[in-house]
Amino acid sequence: MYLKKIFNNKKIVVTGHTGFKVSWLTAWLKLLGANVMGISLNPPTHPSHFLVSKINIGIKDIRLDIRDRKKLEKKFIAFKPNFVFHLAAQPLVGLSYKDPITTWQTNVFGTLNVLESLRKLKNACNVVIITSDKCYFNKEIIFGYKERSEERRVGKECRSRW
């Protein structure tokens, strides 16, 4: 299997690994033989796919808010990942209206914290940053503007630093 050759025995950070979709990604990477470190808040639902499927077994399961740049940097530097899949976010549209500051801090500045943590690494690292379909300037839903902001910021960071 081609993907097994890529990910087997590689160190991979997955942010947001306790969420439903990302827990599936984490399980898949484990099956491919990756050494996974998941960084996330507690599972968002009870029961959760993450806990029921016991995805936490056999990975480094870290509870950490991506808004905490210093702690995030320490984890990245100590782990020395070969790959990072960044999917941690505050994904709920309703909550983004109730608490826009936390949503922006998590989704935009959290992504910047991941990028800064990558920049501190001494080793080469591949990164995949996944946001949502809302980043395509959905003018009916204001929520999408923060995703688009995140997409633009990532592009600027990549062009200016790498």
PLM feature spans:
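Hydrophobic alpha-helical segments, chiefly the membrane-spanning helices
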Residues: 157-162
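N-terminal Rossmann-like NAD(P)+-binding domain of SDR-like oxidoreductases, especially those catalyzing
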Residues: 1-156
